[in-house]
Amino acid sequence: MFENLFSLKGKVALITGGSRGIGRAIALAFAEAGADQVVSSRNKRPPELEKVVEEIKARGKKALSVPAHVGKKEDVQGLVQKTLQTFGRIDILVNNAGANPVLSSMIDLEEDSFEKVLEVNLKGAFLLSKAVAREMIKQGGGGRIINMSSVSGLRARADGTGAYCISKAAMNMMTQVMARELAPHNILVNAIAPGSIKTEFSRVNWTDPERKASRLREIELKRFGEPEEVVGLALLLASGAGSFVTGEIIRVDGGMTI
């Protein structure tokens, strides 16, 4: 009865920020669960992106890489169209692309730096969710949108990551608004809020001795998480196991925000 609960067989997933870290881990897990995929990242990492495509294919699934800047409307349109041209549908969207925090207090933060963070972390997720949701409605049968947020969007920090915190807090509200709007179409929208995960994206948090010590004091499990430890929740939200879950912001943080 429950053996196929986490199966993604016959599904097509679109994953941004898929070249490394959490995005790559989710892509490989989705492949093992049965999903064909389009993985995307910005143009500066095509070799890493192609490697992920080969890893997906090695697991017996179809895959396509599409470099794109999700903050650019024309790139988003191209990404969605290439996915549809290749696979004919989109069942799952994972908005994982993100801009690194700009380390600055709010009063010293430059306007262009603030806009850069919001362009990718918020605007990008908005543009892609909007475009993909429209296709899901046309397709019928529902769909899943998973936004990769952060515990930084759940509480204010005074460590120079203010713009990042703001972008993720806004993403959380967007998640819940879209969950309500899209519920009549059985499109489920949720967010995952990782804590301190050991990725290149957050390298400064686990390589700088002072920041590392500060983070470890906050984490009840007293260690950084690994990208693979986010995968289980992503599978739940993408599969039949999460069919009655929508509008949630779910933390994966080792007890950081208890």
Please state what every model-predicted region is:
Residues 89, 183, 188, 245-247:
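Short, small/polar-rich loop/turn modules that mediate ligand/substrate recognition or access, typified
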Residues 150:
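Residue(s) in the substrate-gating loop at a strand-loop-helix junction
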Residues 104-106, 110-118, 215:
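Substrate-binding pocket helix/loop in short-chain dehydrogenase/reductase
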Residues 134, 180-184, 243:
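Alpha-helical segment proximal to the catalytic Tyr-Lys
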Residues 129, 167, 175:
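Active-site helix of classical SDR
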Residues 35-50:
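Conserved glycine-rich Rossmann-like NAD(P)H-binding loop of the short-chain dehydrogenase/reductase
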Residues 12, 19-20:
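Conserved glycine-rich cofactor-binding loop
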